[in-house]
Amino acid sequence: MPFFMRKKRGEIRHMKKTAAFLVLILLAGALSACQSESGSASSDGKTVQLLNVSYDPTRELYKEYNQAFSSYWKKKTGQDVTVQQSHGGSGKQARSVIDGLDADVVTLALGYDIDSIAEKARLIDQNWQSRLPDQSTPYTSTIVFLVRKGNPKHINDWADLVKKDVSVITPNPKTSGGARWNYLAAWAYADETYHHDDTKIKQFMKDLYGNVEVLDSGARGATTSFTERGMGDVLIAWENEAYLTLKEFGKEKFEIINPSISILAEPPVSVVDKTADKKGTKKAAEAYLSYLYSKKGQEIAAKNFYRPRDKEVLKTYEKQFPKIKTVTVEKEFGGWKKAQETHFNDGGTFDSIYEK
């Protein structure tokens, strides 16, 4: 074989090796980028990144809490932890996790949304509610009204929301967990007022949603429509969101009205087991949720206007939280699975009463 042929083939073999090496480098870089984007534990164990997929109005709560947990975890383990947040309507967020969003933990508006992840994607153990105290709900809230200063439309209870001259703002129960709590609180009032008369209850709900000016996809969007876009006479809102609005905009612009009856809202939390196992973040993810029950975690919840589970912390902040008569989903609606099927699934009661 001529020398120039041997040299050419040698060059070709060298080029193939070089190309293969470059492909490996690119693959390694792509894998590294994917891990960085979704969060993971570093190979040396010195850093960990978590993704908390949460519902709409918890932004301020977890911004403060994440800083406290990072300090606690660093002191306890020597490991640096950063927590990325994703926020949106609770139902929409649950679907994102089901569709592949690599959450290490979920902190959603209601148990049904976490059950959906467990059942449809099998990413969470079925017994998730039993793993932490109070069925994995570290804080509670309820549903109230936010009106403009002076309450010009004289809104004092649910009955005032069906008056023809009242414009209501509430999110869409198809995408928002808070909206489902709002709807069920209104239904509980109608059920008590009309003595379980299903026809009258449905007419009340139809009249109420007939007054709704816009259905935003999440609670924070509804708050923005009411406070910044000037839409509506009344916002049906999470209690914590209403108080946060007063803190941000001032009591000279808005005021809170507590209805005669509301609902005990219990937003739950869970580790996304298979994702955390895959990413090597399980230990930090479990600690992240457990720390919510610590004195520090409970105080941060209370400061952000969530009702803490810890009795001592609740007593410290009791003046902040007025006593409101509430029903529970379990007793009034037979649990979230039944409530979802009856009211919010396609073809359910909400679809029949909302005609816009």
Briefly describe each language-model feature range.
Residues 100-107, 165-167, 228-234:
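Alpha-to-beta junction loops
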